[in-house]
Each structure stands twice: as structure tokens, then as C-alpha cells.
A protein has these predicted regions:
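Juxtamembrane amphipathic/hinge helix adjacent to a transmembrane helix
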Residues: 2-8, 233-254
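Extreme N-terminal signal-anchor transmembrane helix of membrane signaling/transducer proteins, especially
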Residues: 3-48, 265-277
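Amphipathic, soluble alpha/beta structural segments
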Residues: 13-17, 57, 61, 161-170
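Membrane-interface helix-start motif
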Residues: 17, 198, 248-268
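An N-terminal domain-start capping segment
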Residues: 18-27, 70, 128-129, 133
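Juxtamembrane extracytoplasmic/periplasmic/luminal helical "stalk" adjacent to the first N-terminal
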Residues: 27-88
């Protein structure tokens, strides 16, 4: 009996406390706490979704770049076979090589080098004529050409700064006939053009791209630094480059805390507070 009487007094005291307006503060605090927790949960889900998308886009980008490079090697191997079989003349090389470079703008040119490592021809000729007759003197091309000759396999240079400016890399493919070295072909690339032309369009429109060296210095970039998530990016190694060269993909998009969302939060908060006040005013 006494316990029931005590419970009734406590209940009556709580109702009185609520009706006096003290409960309004508690309800408002609980509402905003729950609302804030909901927003934080939604924001984390938003970030997780962006991270998943940028990770997938990075994998797609690296995969497409490698497929593009693999296709170029296959073409250079075909040229090497035609040259070894003495079916490729300088004239036909200029014609088909120039067309291939036009169709694959990540390439600057394709260079024909003889067994003495002297440049004999280059496709396209326009803009590259001045290198004919030169030897292979730059450290990375010299290393890769010798390695390709020794291994009889295509060999990439590391990324290096080109004389013309910007960063470049090359792939060297040897030419042998009856175990006799005949020379090489070199595919000469622009790192910036590789980013621009070797990536799928659906990935380009959603991301900002950078190629970095081992010290995280930017070697090439593509895209506009606008509306990007600095915290939502993915770094992936680019095979076959050495020296820790990586591709960093940063996601485009709007921040979770956008202006429209903030306005919506303020409106909802105002409506909720007005509703709570109206309910307690009628008690």
C-alpha cells in the first residue's frame, strides 16, 4: 500500500515537473541528440560510399591504363616481327606508325633504332624529324634499350623528365632475326597524355587524377580541382613503372554538409521545436 502510494506521488511529481515546462528542455535535448546522431550516421555512410566508389574507380583506371599499354606493346611486337621478316619498309613504317600514334594519343612517337642504337626513323615525322641520326644518350632510354637487347623482351624506362619538358617514359622492343640483333623500336609516351586519353570517360567525369613519384610529388595531373573530397582519395601503384610511381584518384562531388542540407536541418529543427512547444502549451 505504501509502495503504491509512493509510486503515485512520484508519477504525479513527474507529470507536474513536465507540465511546468521542465520536460520541454529534456525533450528538445533528446530530439537534437537523436537528430545529430542520425546525421552523423548518414554522413559516415556517405563517406563510406564515396570511398568505395573511388576505390573502384582507381582499380578501373589502373586496369584500363595497363590494357592500353599492353595493346601498344603488342603493336610494337608486331612491327618488330615485320621488320625482322624484312616486310616493313621505312615508308610503310611511317605510314602505319603515324596512323597508330594518331589513334593512340598517349604516344608521342614510335622510334626506329638500328643495331648501333642510332635513330633511323620516327613516326610521325612531323615534329620529330630533328631526332633522326641521334644516338640514345639519356640514361633511362640507354638503360632500357640495353636491357631489352639482353633479355629479348620489352623493357620500360622509369619515368623521367623529357628534354622538351614534362614527364615521359618509354618502352623498348628488340628486333632479332635468326638470333642476330637488328635494332629496336621505342614507344615514347607523355605521362600527361596517358592520364588524359587512357582513362574511361565515366571515371574521368567523377574524379581528379594525379600521378605521383615515391616522394608524393605530382608528375602529371588531369581534371579540375573543384568540388573534390580531399579525404576521399585512393592511391594505387601503376605497373610497370618503377620508383614507387602511383596513381592518386580523388573523388568529385558535394560535401555531405552542403548548403541545402544545412537549410533543411534548420527548417526541420524549427518545425520540431515549434511542434514540441505547441504540445506542451496545451498540457
Amino acid at each position: 500500500m505504501k509502495q503504491r502510494l509512493l509510486e503515485n506521488r512520484l508519477r504525479a511529481g513527474f507529470v507536474k515537473w513536465v507540465t511546468q515546462g521542465n520536460g520541454l528542455a529534456v525533450v528538445v535535448v533528446v530530439f537534437f541528440f537523436a537528430f545529430g546522431l542520425l546525421l552523423l550516421t548518414l554522413r559516415q555512410r556517405h563517406i563510406d560510399n564515396q570511398e568505395l566508389l573511388v576505390r573502384q574507380d582507381a582499380q578501373t583506371s589502373v586496369g584500363d591504363m595497363q590494357l592500353r599499354l599492353r595493346g601498344d606493346i603488342d603493336y610494337l611486337l608486331l612491327l618488330a616481327k615485320e621488320r625482322a621478316d624484312e616486310k616493313l619498309t621505312p615508308e610503310s613504317f611511317l605510314r602505319i606508325g603515324s596512323q597508330y600514334v594518331a589513334d593512340h594519343p598517349e604516344l608521342i612517337n614510335i622510334t626506329w633504332v638500328d643495331k648501333n642504337l642510332i635513330i633511323q626513323n620516327v613516326a610521325p615525322l612531323q615534329g620529330n624529324r630533328q631526332i633522326i641520326g641521334l644516338g640514345i644518350s639519356l640514361p633511362e632510354p640507354a638503360r632500357a634499350s640495353q636491357a631489352a637487347r639482353q633479355t629479348r623482351q620489352p623493357v620500360y624506362t622509369d619515368v623521367f623528365e623529357a628534354i622538351q619538358g614534362g614527364y615521359s617514359f618509354e618502352v623498348w622492343v628488340p628486333v632479332f632475326r635468326d638470333n642476330q640483333f637488328k635494332g629496336l623500336f621505342a614507344g615514347v609516351y607523355s605521362l600527361g597524355k596517358l592520364l588524359k586519353y587512357a582513362l574511361p570517360l565515366q571515371v574521368q567525369k567523377n574524379n581528379y587524377f594525379e600521378i605521383l613519384d615515391e616522394n608524393r610529388n605530382v608528375l602529371a595531373e588531369f581534371g579540375v580541382r573543384q568540388n573534390v573530397f580531399p579525404q576521399v582519395s585512393k592511391v594505387a601503384p601503376i605497373s610497370p613503372f618503377g620508383n614507387g610511381v602511383t596513381l592518386r584518384v580523388t573523388r568529385f562531388g558535394n560535401e555531405f554538409w552542403s548548403q541545402n542540407l544545412i537549410v533543411l536541418i534548420l527548417v526541420c529543427s524549427g518545425l520540431a521545436m515549434g511542434l514540441v512547444y505547441f504540445m506542451f502549451a496545451r498540457l
